[in-house]
């Protein structure tokens, strides 16, 4: 597996410009499109590269996937059990309380308030993640990545609840 940052000719940093990422992705897709190949071997190689470009783009454009990938590049693999062990009992309790709050909320306006709350939590966490990666503090980056994963779980559960209320 080639380094996704290198593949897209981007600096290996968490705080990437998503517009530049998209521009690089499309430029590389044009360059390595299988239909532009002159030989069958070249076409096969371009198909492999094109597939890798798709994976790289989908990973790097998402804040959580990008954080997990950057940690993986440092040989830190966040599986579910490890994520649970990174958060304090208080943080886990807060998470479960929020899950319960979503479950028990019935008014659409209250669900919208929760949505705004979780978006703010996500943005604050991403800002902390950016700082942790700038400082190369992998311990903090790991913790903030696990928190972001929990926030995403809350957002997903909330989206399901909002859909069921419509």
From Swiss-Prot:
- Give the GO biological process terms: [2Fe-2S] cluster assembly; protein complex oligomerization; protein folding
Renumbered to this chain, the signal peptide range is: none
GO function term, MF aspect, one: ATPase activator activity
**Which Pfam family name is an example for this entry?**
DnaJ
- Alphabetical list of SMART domains matching this protein: DnaJ
- Report the residue ranges that make up the J domain in this protein: 3-73
Q: Which residues form a coiled coil?
A: none
Keywords of the record, alphabetical order, are: Chaperone
Alphabetized InterPro entries for the sequence: DnaJ_domain (IPR001623), HscB (IPR004640), HscB_C_sf (IPR036386), HscB_oligo_C (IPR009073), J_dom_sf (IPR036869)
Q: Which HAMAP family match?
A: HscB (MF_00682)
Give the family from UniProt: Belongs to the HscB family.
Could you give the subunit structure recorded for this chain?
A: Interacts with HscA and stimulates its ATPase activity.
Task: Quote the NCBIfam families the UniProt record gives.
Answer: hscB
User: What is the purpose of this protein?
Assistant: Co-chaperone involved in the maturation of iron-sulfur cluster-containing proteins. Seems to help targeting proteins to be folded toward HscA.
Per its record, how is this protein called by name? Co-chaperone protein HscB homolog
- Species of provenance: Rickettsia prowazekii (strain Madrid E)
Gene name for this UniProt entry: hscB
